[in-house]
Regions:
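Structured helix-beta-strand junction loops
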Residues: 42-43, 63-64, 70, 138-141
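Mixed-charge interfacial surface used for oligomerization/domain docking
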Residues: 2-12, 16-18, 22-23, 75-79, ...
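N-terminal glycine-rich phosphate/adenylate-binding segment common to multiple enzyme folds
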Residues: 53-84, 88-90
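N-terminal glycine-rich anion-binding loop in soluble enzyme alpha/beta folds
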Residues: 1-52
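Short coil/turn segments at secondary-structure boundaries
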Residues: 51-55, 149-150
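Short catalytic-loop micro-motif centered on adjacent basic/acidic residues
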Residues: 48, 69, 101
């Protein structure tokens, strides 16, 4: 559910990087996601991610009078902190310009819901403060549920033990989870099978 463009609004994607010993993938809409996924399935080394830095966020904010940024959960990435630092710097260097940064406390699909709601508010011509207030209200009513087919990537980046990932693969176990109110990705249950 990556979001690279959003019709009807001036939109900028500030991407994460996916890093292996052999390659660096920039999740910006031009990346060959299927090719990367195939490579990672057979890759034996560690993988990691890198969040956008303050300069990346400042480049995205450049020239705008009002900026609304929605980040991946701050519990998984430093994106929110970098976006906040960039917001402070941008507003200091550009008096009168305003930046609102929202930690989605989530990933993917919920971020899309937030971005689409933001677009709709802007299309209605709402004022900056009203948009910020409504986004905080709306955010309380969105949630993320997810299903993981494989734990391989979590094992490669040290979040689960490789033996656990291998056992889950052999037994056909899928993890069903949700994003908590604090932005943690929590396991709800484990199930077996394809669907």
């Amino acid at each position: 559910a990556s979001l690279y463009t959003l019709q009807g609004v001036d939109f900028e994607c500030v991407p994460l990087k996916i890093i292996t010993d052999d390659a660096e993938y920039l999740d910006n809409g031009t990346m060959d996601a299927l090719g990367m996924a195939q490579t990672l399935r057979t890759y034996k080394g560690k993988t990691s991610t890198s969040c956008p830095n303050v300069s990346d966020w400042l480049a995205a904010y450049e020239g705008a009078d009002e900026v609304y940024a929605i980040t991946i959960t701050g519990t998984l990435s430093g994106s929110y902190n970098a976006a906040q630092l960039a917001a402070e710097e941008y507003q200091q260097e550009n008096p009168g310009k305003r930046v609102f940064v929202l930690d989605s406390l989530s990933t993917g699909p919920e971020q899309r819901l937030l971005a689409e709601h933001l677009r709709d508010l802007l299309a209605e011509g709402r004022e900056f403060d009203e948009v910020c207030e409504e986004m905080l209200r709306y955010h309380k009513h969105t949630h993320l549920l997810f299903s993981l087919e494989s734990l391989a990537n979590l094992a490669r980046n040290g979040r689960v033990k490789p033996a656990v990932a291998a056992m889950a693969r052999m037994l056909g176990i899928r993890v069903i989870g949700q994003a908590s109110e604090a932005g943690e990705l929590d396991v709800l249950c484990k199930t077996r099978g394809e669907h």
